[in-house]
């Protein structure tokens, strides 16, 4: 079996590593991949990113299955284009992908199908939004409607920051169109949780829960990032929380997908807030999370390719996902200055010395030497019987990694 995997992050390295364990898989082409996938078992990087190039490659090389890692190609409709050419691809169609591609679309979907979520209002005019914000209770949350690489959500403590955010999103257009429309949302106090899941359109099967650490500094301080580390399972996801999630969020979501007749065979990522008033849905993503994937797939005992094939065959209800006992932790190492300005091109040592597993993201391989090429560079993932053991092992591995300006949080798994 030959697989084409689209993407270049730590998530895609984890997906490639997990899919390579399937005995039927002979080759995984990573488009474009990174320095980690370049050396991963059964993997080969191919320098392709445009949809038409990927379609041509899949056709010419008799690719059996294409798997899409990041959200942007899904929102752009890559699944529809592959299917029009008769090619097998895992991911939602363009309409289903709008659950992530447009915050207003997803909030309207939640409201229509009684998915428990925060109160909200949508604006396309900056002056109207500023007038509305004058009457709001703070803190308040402002979200760019479109894709913003995980950086389009700002929690505003006061009107001053809210005004600055609206001007940046809607007037200065910092997200190149994605913030021209905004969702202004009630702030929910609580603990965040991520539940990744897989659907064939007939059933949604949740994975083990996880917890991301979004902010750059220890103690959950500073600006949001794509994610600085994760743990799984999430200690706040009690049986009671998971039951509420299933009844008030998962089940109505599935009803909505079916009622809207969405072409949705793929991943649904539920971003949750666990509050004193119950469990709320903050957002949908239509792909695996990063860095959540690097702990969730590390705990998955079942074969990932078999699971995807069960979804493609509309037989997910028959698939019982097995998980390793214990816990997992991953710690992300970033370039100095991330998530703002940072330099790249620094030599990296220690990647191959890990006791568990290092998944590469902003890493390139030059003449056999690993070098930094992005903001989030890599992450060290580890399993342990206890959460403390998993955390300790992940930090032991991250401390082996060396590059100029390396930065990582010291409190992954310890902060609320």
Swiss-Prot record:
The cofactor note reads: Binds 1 Mg(2+) or Mn(2+) ion per subunit.
**Which residues take part in binding ATP?**
133-194
ATP-grasp domain span: 107-313
Q: Which cofactor does it need?
A: Mg(2+); Mn(2+)
* Reaction equations catalysed: 5-phospho-beta-D-ribosylamine + glycine + ATP = N(1)-(5-phospho-beta-D-ribosyl)glycinamide + ADP + phosphate + H(+)
Does the UniProt entry include the keyword Metal-binding?
yes
- Whether Transferase counts among this entry's keywords is no
Q: Any idea of its EC number?
A: 6.3.4.13
Q: Which GO terms describe its molecular function?
A: ATP binding; metal ion binding; phosphoribosylamine-glycine ligase activity
Per the record, the domain of life is Bacteria
InterPro entries listed in its UniProt record: ATP-grasp, ATP_grasp_subdomain_1, PreATP-grasp_dom_sf, PRibGlycinamid_synth_ATP-grasp, PRibGlycinamide_synth, PRibGlycinamide_synth_C-dom, PRibGlycinamide_synth_C_sf, PRibGlycinamide_synth_CS
Keywords for this protein = ATP-binding, Ligase, Magnesium, Manganese, Metal-binding, Nucleotide-binding, Purine biosynthesis
Which annotated residues bind Mg(2+)?
283, 285
Q: Which Pfam families match?
A: GARS_A (PF01071), GARS_C (PF02843), GARS_N (PF02844)
Q: What class of enzyme is it?
A: ligase
Which family is this protein grouped under?
Belongs to the GARS family.
What name is this protein filed under? Phosphoribosylamine--glycine ligase
Q: Which organism is it from?
A: Clostridium acetobutylicum (strain ATCC 824 / DSM 792 / JCM 1419 / IAM 19013 / LMG 5710 / NBRC 13948 / NRRL B-527 / VKM B-1787 / 2291 / W)
């Amino acid at each position: 079996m030959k697989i084409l995997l689209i993407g270049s992050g730590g998530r895609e390295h984890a997906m490639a590593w997990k899919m390579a364990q399937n005995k039927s898989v002979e080759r995984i082409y990573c488009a474009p991949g990174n320095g980690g996938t370049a050396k991963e078992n059964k993997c080969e990087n191919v320098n392709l990113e445009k949809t038409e190039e990927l379609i041509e490659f899949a056709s010419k090389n008799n690719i059996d299955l294409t798997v899409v890692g990041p959200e942007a190609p899904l929102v752009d409709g890559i699944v529809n284009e592959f299917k029009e050419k008769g090619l097998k691809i895992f991911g939602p169609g363009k309409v289903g992908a709008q659950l992530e591609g447009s915050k207003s679309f997803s909030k309207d979907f939640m409201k229509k199908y009684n998915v428990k979520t925060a109160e909200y209002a949508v604006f396309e005019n900056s002056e109207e939004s500023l007038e509305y914000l004058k009457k709001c209770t703070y803190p308040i949350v402002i979200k760019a409607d479109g894709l913003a690489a995980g950086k389009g959500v700002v929690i505003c403590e006061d009107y001053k920051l809210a005004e600055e955010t609206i001007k940046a999103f809607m007037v200065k257009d910092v997200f190149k169109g994605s913030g021209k429309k905004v969702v202004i949302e009630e702030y929910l106090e609580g603990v965040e949780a991520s539940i990744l899941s897989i659907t064939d359109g007939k059933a949604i099967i949740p994975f083990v829960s996880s917890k991301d650490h979004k902010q750059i500094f220890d103690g959950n301080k500073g600006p949001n990032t794509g994610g600085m580390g994760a743990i799984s399972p999430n200690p706040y996801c009690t049986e009671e929380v998971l039951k509420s999630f299933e009844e008030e969020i998962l089940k109505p979501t599935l009803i909505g997908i079916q009622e809207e007749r969405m072409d949705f065979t793929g991943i649904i990522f539920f971003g949750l807030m666990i509050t004193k008033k119950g469990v709320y849905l903050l957002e949908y993503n239509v792909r695996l999370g990063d860095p959540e994937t690097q702990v969730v797939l590390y705990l998955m005992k079942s074969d990932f390719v078999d699971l995807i094939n069960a979804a493609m065959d509309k037989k997910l209800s028959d698939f019982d996902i097995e998980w390793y006992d214990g816990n997992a932790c991953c710690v992300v190492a970033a370039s100095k200055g991330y998530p703002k300005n940072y330099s790249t091109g620094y030599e990296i040592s220690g990647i191959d010395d890990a006791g568990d597993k290092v998944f590469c993201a902003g890493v390139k391989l030059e003449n056999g030497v690993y070098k930094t090429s992005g903001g989030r560079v890599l992450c060290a993932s580890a399993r342990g019987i206890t959460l403390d053991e998993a955390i300790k092992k992940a930090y032991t591995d991250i401390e082996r990694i060396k590059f100029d300006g390396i930065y990582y949080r010291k409190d992954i798994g310890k902060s609320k």
